[in-house]
Curated annotation (Swiss-Prot):
GO molecular function, one term: ATP binding
Protein known as: Nucleotide-binding protein SMU_1306c
Family recorded in the similarity comment: Belongs to the RapZ-like family.
Amino acids binding ATP: 13-20
Function: Displays ATPase and GTPase activities.
Origin species: Streptococcus mutans serotype c (strain ATCC 700610 / UA159)
PANTHER family to which the protein is assigned, alphabetical: RNASE ADAPTER PROTEIN RAPZ
InterPro entries, A to Z: P-loop_NTPase (IPR027417), RapZ-like (IPR005337), RapZ-like_N (IPR053930), RapZ_C (IPR053931)
Key word Membrane present: no
Residues binding GTP, per UniProt: 63-66
Assigned keywords, A-Z: ATP-binding, GTP-binding, Nucleotide-binding
UniProt xrefs under Pfam families: PapZ_C (PF22740), RapZ-like_N (PF03668)
Phylogenetic lineage: Bacteria, Bacillati, Bacillota, Bacilli, Lactobacillales
Amino acid sequence: MSEKKIDLVIVTGMSGAGKTVAIQSFEDLGYFTIDNMPPALVPKFLELVESSGENDKVALVVDMRSRLFFKEVSSILDKIDLNETINFRILFLDATDSELVSRYKETRRSHPLATTGRVLDGIALERELLAPLKNLSQNVVDTTDLTPRQLRKTISDQFSVEKSQTSFRLEVVSFGFKYGLPLDADLVFDVRFLPNPYYKPELRDKTGLDKDVSDYVMQHQESEEFYQHLLALLAPILPGYQKEGKSVLTIAIGCTGGQHRSVAFAHRLAQDLGQNWTVNESHRDKNRRKETVNRS
């Protein structure tokens, strides 16, 4: 048996959320991959991998097919967890219900759990059955607004074989509550209580990345007080998540539309945290209002 530990990634999540693209991405990263492996076969397969010693990076798509799914997977994860020769993580792919419905309509495929024929019924049942597994997942990726290329990059950033297994990265994202919470957010902070630049005509069409907007947001006493409290709160939290083995922590800052206040806060937070941590900064809804106006 090989003494080298096996790096195992179990890919799961909502049907239509991008598991096929994900498993192709792992193959490009040098992982040995298998799509749609029945949960019951996973332990025997891992035994064969260990005994051969030929593959130390493995990614498996474990698909949802029945109500027995979580019971089977939970039992398997318990066994894997006891195996000191395997390091494993769960990648859970998710997307909003509306986006999943749109993808099914585009491909004209039926949902595997939609016994009544309605895609939404299948999505609702699958989301309920997968909820416990999502809670166990170390990596949750919301693919709602991701192109296949962007999803591949996300997976490469999180699972590239060149990266250390102990690496820890922060994702700081701004968003608008009116467009929904980011599904992959670990920590969510609400800045809607701050004065809104939207009501300043000269600032309305700008974003929190513009200096005059950022200055307006941060000039208020409550803004600076909240920001300093936020930094103090995160100081002990981040090392704790790192110690527990979490590879990616997503911090989401939200305001009403995701254009001004949350963008200014997220940008400043990313810059400050970047002095001590690896940080990726993104602004999900920064241009959403402008795009909506242009389409109307």
